[in-house]
Amino acid sequence: MVYSYTEKKRIRKDFGKRPQVLDVPYLLSIQLDSFQKFIEQDPEGQYGLEAAFRSVFPIQSYSGNSELQYVSYRLGEPVFDVKECQIRGVTYSAPLRVKLRLVIYEREAPEGTVKDIKEQEVYMGEIPLMTDNGTFVINGTERVIVSQLHRSPGVFFDSDKGKTHSSGKVLYNARIIPYRGSWLDFEFDPKDNLFVRIDRRRKLPATIILRALDYTTEQILDLFFEKVVFEIRDNKLQMELIPERLRGETASFDIEANGKIYVEKGRRITARHIRQLEKDEIKHIEVPVEYIAGKVAAKDYVDASTGELICPANMELSLDLLAKLSQSGHKRIETLFTNDLDHGPYISETVRVDPTTDRLSALVEIYRMMRPGEPPTREAAESLFENLFFSEDRYDLSAVGRMKFNRSLLRDEIEGSGILSKADIIDVMKKLIDIRNGKGEVDDIDHLGNRRIRSVGEMAENQFRVGLVRVERAVKERLSLGDLDTLMPQDMINAKPISAAVKEFFGSSQLSQFMDQNNPLSEITHKRRISALGPGGLTRERAGFEVRDVHPTHYGRVCPIETPEGPNIGLINSLSVYAQTNEYGFLETPYRKVTDGVVTDEIHYLSAIEEGNYVIAQANTNLTEEGRFADDLVTCRSKGESSLFSADQVDYMDVSTQQVVSVGASLIPFLEHDDANRALMGANMQRQAVPTLRADKPLVGTGMERAVAVDSGVTAVAKRGGIVQYVDASRIVIKVNEDEMYPGEAGIDIYNLTKYTRSNQNTCINQMPCVSLNEPVERGDVLADGPSTDLGELALGQNMRVAFMPWNGYNFEDSILVSERVVQEDRFTTIHIQELACVSRDTKLGPEEITADIPNVGEAALSKLDESGIVYIGAEVTGGDILVGKVTPKGETQLTPEEKLLRAIFGEKASDVKDSSLRVPNGVSGTVIDVQVFTRDGVEKDKRALEIEEMQLKQAKKDLSEELQILEAGLFSRIRAVLIAGGVEAEKLDKLPRDRWLELGLTDEEKQNQLEQLAEQYDELKHEFEKKLEAKRRKITQGDDLAPGVLKIVKVYLAVKRQIQPGDKMAGRHGNKGVISKINPIEDMPYDENGTPVDIVLNPLGVPSRMNIGQILETHLGMAAKGIGDKINAMLKRQEEVAKLREFIQKAYDLGQDVRQKVDLNTFSDDEVLRLAENLRKGMPLATPVFDGAKEAEIKELLQLGDLPTSGQITLFDGRTGEQFERPVTVGYMYMLKLNHLVDDKMHARSTGSYSLVTQQPLGGKAQFGGQRFGEMEVWALEAYGAAYTLQEMLTVKSDDVNGRTKMYKNIVDGNHQMEPGMPESFNVLLKEIRSLGINIELEDE
């Protein structure tokens, strides 16, 4: 492998054995590609805004003499960039401007004569833009639009599996689901009649739809039945014979022809009989007259002479009717062919229950069902039916729907119209009847070929279309009303409904979610989430077991592991690592093509529909050198089943072993040794890990860490290669390589880093450079680490030395015993940033004022405020401290004579205001790290606001001028090169001031041209700088757009440092979670022979029953990694020769059986080897990919190389007594996470507080400062113990006895510890409720 200079700093040893055929794709592409499709101009008009505009425009007036046409659209530039939007609390969006054309036609002239055309660009609201990381900033907070898994449009055939009817009869149904429009359902009832429902309304006989489509009874029967023809010859009845139709029936008479008896009466007709009849080519047989009785006529029979209808179609024939038919000259009678086996009489029966006879009555029946209570007219009924399924405005199957529809009906072409046709409806009914007759199968609705993904772009487009349709009505009215000569497109379009629809979707849709920003993994997982809930999806209550279950088609598309526990299990899923969506929105996964038994590197993406036809081998199948299968029989998947196939039957092979799982699960080493339930918890808990103060890469990883860290966007990644020219904590400057520069640019890339900002979950986002001055970097290298990343690798937790042993009951039931050393070294110390806001409003009594002059507050409380009444940066504050002083005017109250006197003596004291300052919430303490003041336009800024403004201006100017200097330097170095090449002497040139260089003239014309070009660039650079500075200044000084009635907002940011403490929740990556029970002194912890104490003691009993053995293997491998690190560390301390160091490290990298990773340290310089060794001191990072990890033998080899016992167990000594424990203990290094369930956030106590209004009981929950509920079962417990007084106290004074609790408080204050219980308020509520039922109930005083 070739490593870049940055990648050589630390190389993770990989145990993977399967070759990496396909790199992990960009993990956020599902979001970015979808949104890109939405906003980019699509000339085809298939997707995005373009499609929405084309589907609604042109809008014609009712009279048809004017129309509004759509020409094109463009998106403007956003006013603020992403960071500014987050600070100001506004939406990151761009204005949408649409060019419309108003065409007015001549009224009297022939059609299509244009009278006037006006074109104008119209503003149509703001469209939120996606940031580079796939999120949206809505009102200053980052949100993610989760993709939705919904039922694909098309036709589905299903059955109720015998659950509807008591007899257990299976009822089949078909459902046509459009992308938008009415659903059409066909269903059988227990009597085998076929019914239809529109939009799940009342059911009607299915033939009504056919009649409404203008079919007669005869035509209907003709469509669905084959015919049996009888002929009357010489008063004998003959039947045209098709032998195959007799199969399985019992002969009710002798079947004979030409004097030969083929089947005797009462015998069953078998395949042998049929073969004989066919062989002898028997076309007619004579049947007894009774045989025709009970058959059904296939068409109307009319008496030719009188015109009288003798026998209508679908009537049962009897012997009398036969005689009548014979008399009136009908010698050939057609009947319907039905039997009990595979030609049921369903449609014929349905026609009998159908009350309608012609098209009009059918339309009226449909109208009555859709609009009950309205009087039907012919026009209304016709237009309603037309609009239901045959109007492009109201009904659209979409391209996907049409494709699925045609595939389901086995048609050849997969494209077609978006509306239904007669043939469509009839084909669906025919297929449903075939399924009822036993031909064909019902669909599996949980198959991923029947469920598709709706991503951001598509959902935004739908919302936008909704907005446009609302505008369309208004435009139509305007066109009809107005004076068209003066109208402009702008006067007709109101942007409000459009922007409201879009805003509503991004702001409050169920699928627009507050981004989970605990750490980079939780961000990535949130963006790759797939939800079956949401508008147009399932609901938690309705979803059954089948929908939630893992389906064979999930393989490689949706992760079988990562899904929430609880009510949403299986409804919210995660995209697998390599999965992507195809043009129709179905999930597809990559496979390697197998040609002639050789596995090629050609990659094909297959959707679940296509995959069903192939035989697919697993990724871990053994291959020979040439790429053939090593074994004759290979385990493969085909048609949803897994079995053995011979090697020449295989069509495809999996790309990678981690193809099955999602990003979260692919980060769990030794996943293959964990029980699925625990793996699920492990994957979910990694997302809750809080970024620690110093990130620490996992010693045992899976090799996915780098991909996650880079793709999540929390790190700064080099856009182009070059040399690090400047680096400090807040910016990195790269001088770009010559070959990567655009012609005529300065070739400088500047990366500004994010410092100490707050995430959505109040964790700290901070970037730190990880490159040094003059280092070479390549494109894609990580320049700066973000939260939870270490040298460009995801690092969610810390490597801890763990021992599996009980320790005095402190690790009973999943508790965790932690050494004090962990606290001292700040291993799990985290920084949390809280934002507290103070809003000053305009009230009826006057404006609230932010000031340091607060009534009745001592000097001490104001000590941390400046003269504007706002806390200064760097102040350390605790609960109850004032952060922003604010007073609110209160109404004049009647003054007591004493107050009047005092006010007369001491002058006007501010009694007409009350203190409403922003204080630090109880239980919170920290350091103020930032203050921001937002002032409404037109309100005078206070001193602090002006100071902040000035500081921001200074900073902006400094940033821009530094940027300018860097760019100038780059430019002048190029100018100097041109001048020297043009013949100017270097010494003379250096004596001249730089700005005079451009005045020099060169004789060489080409060089002079270059010089002039550079001079132009220089001018442009300066001009650009002035422009940027002016724009920045305008943004900083302009007033803020605040909510109505708000004058000022002051936001204070507090940073809180939280050390780990008892009650915090910790976990490993294998679902092994626990709560810290005790922080133990270092000297009491168990230690080994070298005197090294362990950091954490875990309970060994937590492993066997939970079957997550991965944690033990991780512990052993971690120990080996650390052992090798220790040896390297010792060699570095002894200052061994580089050659020896290189040899040892090379040995470690080469270890293992046929691993795919080849690291050749001979290509590294001595410096690079030393730097690599320096980074391996604390342990050699290892990767064991999912399902392709380290084997037991390899772990033992590695342990031997690190001079450690191969059992992975060592002798420990008790820290308190110094005695040896009686048996060796498993000790090693495990990667532990601190989860965002901190005891500080949960700890809560209440004395008195707020009460519920009706019941007068204390509220519940920490947010309401509520009490602990003493519930029904707790009352039973006290009753069982007969603790009457305790119980009385609980049910009265501690709960809802209003007088009692006030008295009790008073008594406590007076030092009299007595209580007088009274009547609980909830009893009064009960009395009132009984009285409201009209029962008078009173308490009698005894």
Swiss-Prot record:
Keywords: DNA-directed RNA polymerase, Nucleotidyltransferase, Transcription, Transferase. It is an enzyme of class 2 (transferase). It catalyses: RNA(n) + a ribonucleoside 5'-triphosphate = RNA(n+1) + diphosphate. The keyword Nucleotidyltransferase applies. It comes from the Bacteria. The keyword Isomerase does not apply. Its EC number is 2.7.7.6. GO terms for molecular function: DNA binding; DNA-directed RNA polymerase activity; ribonucleoside binding. This is DNA-directed RNA polymerase subunit beta. It comes from Cronobacter sakazakii (strain ATCC BAA-894) (Enterobacter sakazakii). The gene is rpoB.
